[in-house]
């Protein structure tokens, strides 16, 4: 059998992986083996952090709602409890935006919930 030189396809594959990790430092962007490992680690980290981002934002929203509701004399826990009791189910993201951008509206909403 004749010898087959692995030229074009192998180069294309390596070039694609090296292009993916081109922003890395040192050997991680130059050497193929190290770059290949770096790529797999980068994809694992990206997947993990996409899931973590959801948790982080939820924590941020809860913190903002808690700060705004405590300024009006009610804890976050009681505020959410009153919302469920009145069946006013709005998501935490919207509540946090109202609390940050329009604090007067949040205060009025809180007073209406407490009165009724």
Swiss-Prot record:
Keywords: Chloroplast, Plastid, Ribonucleoprotein, Ribosomal protein, RNA-binding, rRNA-binding. InterPro entries: Ribosomal_bL20, RIBOSOMAL_L20_CS, Ribosomal_protein_bL20_C. It is found in: Plastid, Chloroplast. CDD domains: Ribosomal_L20. One of its GO terms (biological process) is ribosomal large subunit assembly. Pfam families: Ribosomal_L20. It comes from the Eukaryota. Gene3D superfamilies: 6.10.160.10, Ribosomal protein L20. Its main location: plastid. GO terms for cellular component: chloroplast; ribonucleoprotein complex; ribosome. GO terms for molecular function: rRNA binding; structural constituent of ribosome. Belongs to the bacterial ribosomal protein bL20 family. Binds directly to 23S ribosomal RNA and is necessary for the in vitro assembly process of the 50S ribosomal subunit. It is not involved in the protein synthesizing functions of that subunit. This is Large ribosomal subunit protein bL20c. It comes from Cryptomeria japonica. The lineage of its organism: Eukaryota, Viridiplantae, Streptophyta, Embryophyta, Tracheophyta.
């Amino acid at each position: 059998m004749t010898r087959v030189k692995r030229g074009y396809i192998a180069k294309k594959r390596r070039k694609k992986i090296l292009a993916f990790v081109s922003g890395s430092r040192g050997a991680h962007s130059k050497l193929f083996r190290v770059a290949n490992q770096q790529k797999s680690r980068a994809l694992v980290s990206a997947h993990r952090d996409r899931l973590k981002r959801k948790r982080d934002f939820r924590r941020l929203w809860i913190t903002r709602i808690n700060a705004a509701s405590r300024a009006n004399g009610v804890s976050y826990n009681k505020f959410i409890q009153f919302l469920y009791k009145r069946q006013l189910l709005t998501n935490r993201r919207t509540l946090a935006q109202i609390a940050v951008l329009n604090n007067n509206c949040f205060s009025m909403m809180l007073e209406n919930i407490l009165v009724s």
